[in-house]
């Protein structure tokens, strides 16, 4: 049943980590869980896809220590979150403290997403934005898959459901490139879901990204170099013999100078 279960929840404790890491008394657990939902909802409203300044928020991780809350905001555009001179992150902290009330200390750590085109949520968000602009879903999905493949992933699957291109009858279409082994527990699979609100109704977008297998005791293999890196390395190799010739000529000139 690997095709049906949530890929992230299926791998918690194996290859995936919890987004909220804290312990609480059973009586306080519902209250703190609701606080986590409010924190993520507030950050999504201020910096998410529908905000004026879209920072490309991929994930928000929450840790609690006594009266202190540590937030780790993974974003594609950290400059938008931090703001000029740190004004943006300070305004975000003040807004969160006002939302929760009380003497809560909130620490915000902004982490930049290294491979934006390989992040499942950012891919789903990109597809949703294009669908809301009435772009053909097949063109959008093909473009998103090509960008993800250039980022060095091993497989991707994209599913779009709803009244596609304004059709009278809703349907579901999906496209897969490469391997997406949902039954393999050691597979590092990133999954996300996003909705696009169009004039014809709501479209659901699901994205599965397979980044490789995580085997205990082995380091995670680095992603393959991009086309730009390969071209730069090839240029360095082409220039290397020329540098050696210049060094040899310089050495011969110095030898003649010493003889004279």
UniProtKB/Swiss-Prot annotation:
Signal peptide (from-to): none
Superkingdom as given in the UniProt entry: Bacteria
Keywords: Ribonucleoprotein, Ribosomal protein, RNA-binding, rRNA-binding
Alphabetical list of SMART domains matching this protein: KH
Gene Ontology BP terms: translation
Pfam families, alphabetized: KH_2, Ribosomal_S3_C
Region (Disordered): 219-260
UniProt xrefs under CDD domains: KH-II_30S_S3 (cd02412)
Domain KH type-2: from-to ranges: 39-114
Keyword RNA-binding (UniProt): yes
PROSITE patterns, alphabetized: KH_TYPE_2 (PS50823), RIBOSOMAL_S3 (PS00548)
Composition-biased stretches (Basic and acidic residues): 227-243, 251-260
GO CC aspect terms: cytosolic small ribosomal subunit
Biological role: Binds the lower part of the 30S subunit head. Binds mRNA in the 70S ribosome, positioning it for translation.
Quaternary structure and partners: Part of the 30S ribosomal subunit. Forms a tight complex with proteins S10 and S14.
Record family assignment: Belongs to the universal ribosomal protein uS3 family.
Descriptive protein name: Small ribosomal subunit protein uS3
